[in-house]
Amino acid sequence: MISVNDFRTGLTIAVDNGLWQVLDFQHVKPGKGAAFVRSKLRNLRTGSVQEKTFRAGEKVEKAHIENRRMQYLYASGEAHVFMDNGTYEQIELGEKQIERELKFLKENMEVSIMTYQGEVLGVELPNTVELQVTETEPGIKGDTASNVTKPATLETGLVVQVPIFINEGEMLIINTGEGKYVSRA
């Protein structure tokens, strides 16, 4: 059990028959009445975000999430296959389960699989990934006004805004949290 006063971003808790990750929290001390903690939580099973208020000092159960290093192997229809590098055990995750992460996954990529009491919750990506540009308009020489961008389609199908000097075939570093261009690889 953990007190809501000890909340921090990224903490995983078990409340109301659900597993929740704390996205944001705020301690509130009104002029009248008892203090409370207002929090923004994301359900790890469904991905939905909800705001919940707790009384100050209230206790909640801390969920112990296990992260297993795995390698993304391939897609087989709606299923995506991952392999544990130590035990060579393979697991399949459905497209709905990893919908957001699919835009960044490519074969043989190392990821972290989050599990809770044997149940697979999802995929945790590295902060950045290297992806190749498969389609983009050619940059126009002399068009160098500040912060000019153009859309580029990457090898996974993700479309990002990139500077005009980026060409097809180049490797880019993409931030997985925001889905944005960082730099050339």
UniProtKB/Swiss-Prot annotation:
GO terms for molecular function: translation elongation factor activity. It is found in: Cytoplasm. Pathway: Protein biosynthesis; polypeptide chain elongation. The keyword Protein biosynthesis applies. It comes from the Bacteria. Pfam families: EFP, EFP_N, Elong-fact-P_C. Keywords: Cytoplasm, Elongation factor, Protein biosynthesis. GO terms for biological process: peptide biosynthetic process. GO terms for cellular component: cytoplasm. Belongs to the elongation factor P family. HAMAP family: EF_P. Involved in peptide bond synthesis. Stimulates efficient translation and peptide-bond synthesis on native or reconstituted 70S ribosomes in vitro. Probably functions indirectly by altering the affinity of the ribosome for aminoacyl-tRNA, thus increasing their reactivity as acceptors for peptidyl transferase. PANTHER family: ELONGATION FACTOR P, ELONGATION FACTOR P (EF-P) FAMILY PROTEIN. This is Elongation factor P. It comes from Bacillus anthracis. The gene is efp.
